[in-house]
Design a protein with these regions (language model features):
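Conserved core of the PLP fold type I
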Residues: 53-73, 103-110
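Conserved PLP-anchoring active-site segment centered on the Schiff-base-forming lysine
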Residues: 71-89, 118
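Conserved C-terminal alpha-helix-loop-beta "cap" of PLP-dependent enzymes
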Residues: 74-76, 268-343
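PLP-dependent aminotransferase-class I/II
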Residues: 99-144, 151-158
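Active-site C-terminal subdomain of aminotransferase-like
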Residues: 108, 135-136, 142, 150, ...
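Catalytic PLP-binding core of fold-type I/II PLP enzymes
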Residues: 151-183
Length: 345
């Protein structure tokens, strides 16, 4: 069976394994206070046009989101998210467990819009009794979204303007950040994110690392005490250099971008095959997640050779499924899938 169900079904990129092996007999100080974490921070900062930021390394995305958002907010403040936002659907109530309400707004093509955010923020101010309500304070975005769609620079600038107008923090979940920044139509850079967000994280788990995410805190208001809050929540890895070394390997020669770009290109080949076969795509995007509408029979046929992910039932005869490529996807695997799509009834 060939796996197209997600982008974290392999270990790590060979260059990362090589770096880990070569340094395995060396000893370092703990808790991300080591040369490799410093090198990784510097390599990332090289892409931020000199922005003054703090960078913290953690294990996984849900951990980053739960720790960061709880640290950034007062107990009575809430988070604006798309209904299909990862924190709203797929983090087992991690945010709510910290005591914060998620205000879920209907997504437009998988994304929030500046108008939706402004309307929600204005409704709070117009309520007549805001002191009886949670205060919307942070906007949560994912790019790519849960449906592979991405934000343009203009969309982010519009959302930033609304956040400034209403005093909201802007936070971006970057679990699949590489697949967005490497997409053929992406006009956003890491430097733009450092300019437009208050905090964002650079995903490693889904982009070549064994595990690991790099949280970039831009807004100075959000930095004080963050390391201690992370430790209190169990998010500080004693052997922190294992994370720093991985991110340094990904960013020292832009490996992060080349391996995710290849995944995007392979995903486009899959999408093209589905479209040429007369099938409908649920969303249009240029990243590594492709959502297609299949008949039950077509899904059963492809399911004999490939593992892919069910998304939702369309009707009694059709379902929407996700095919996902990654840094580890082989060209031959995609070629075989394309061949089977072409002969599929």
């Amino acid at each position: 069976m060939i796996r197209f169900n997600n982008d974290y079904n392999h270990g790590a990129h060979p260059e990362i394994l090589k770096a880990l092996q070569e340094t395995n007999t060396e000893s370092y100080g703990g808790y991300s206070r080591d040369p490799w974490c410093e090198k990784a921070r510097e390599a990332i900062r090289q892409h931020l046009n000199g922005a003054d930021v703090d960078i913290h390394f953690m294990i996984g995305g849900t951990q980053v989101n739960a720790i960061a958002l709880s640290a950034f907010l007062r107990p009575y403040q809430s988070i604006i998210s798309a209904t299909n936002g990862h924190i709203n659907l797929h983090e087992a109530g991690a945010i709510e467990h910290t005591g914060h309400k998620i205000v879920a707004l209907p997504a437009v093509n998988g994304k929030l819009t500046a108008d939706l955010i402004a309307a929600e923020a204005q409704a709070y101010h117009d309520s007549g009794c805001p002191e009886y309500m949670t205060e919307p304070k942070l906007v949560f975005l994912s790019s790519p979204s849960e449906y592979g769609t991405t934000y343009t620079k203009a969309e982010l600038e519009g959302i930033r303007q609304v956040c400034d107008q209403y005093g909201l923090y802007l936070y971006l979940d970057g679990a699949r950040l590489g697949y967005w920044l490497s997409a053929s139509d992406c006009d956003v850079t890491l430097a733009d994110l450092a300019r437009l967000t208050d905090a964002f994280y650079i995903g490693g788990t889904k982009c070549g690392c064994l595990m690991g995410e790099a949280l970039v805190i831009v807004n100075p208001e959000l930095r004080h005490g963050f390391w201690t809050a992370t430790k209190q929540s169990g998010g500080v890895l004693a052997k922190g250099w294992l994370l720093g070394l991985q991110f340094y390997t990904l960013f020292k020669d832009d490996l992060y971008f080349s391996i995710t770009r290849q995944a995007d290109e392979l995903a486009t080949q899959i999408e093209t095959a589905f479209v040429n076969a007369g099938l409908s795509m649920y969303t249009k995007n240029t990243t590594n997640q492709k959502f297609v509408i299949l008949s039950n029979e077509q899904a059963e046929y492809l399911g004999k050779s490939y593992i892919f992910e069910f998304d939702h039932k369309v009707d009694d005869e059709h379902i929407c499924v996700r095919f996902c490529t990654s840094w580890s996807t082989e060209t031959t695997e995609v070629q075989q899938l394309v061949k089977d799509i072409c002969i599929m009834k």
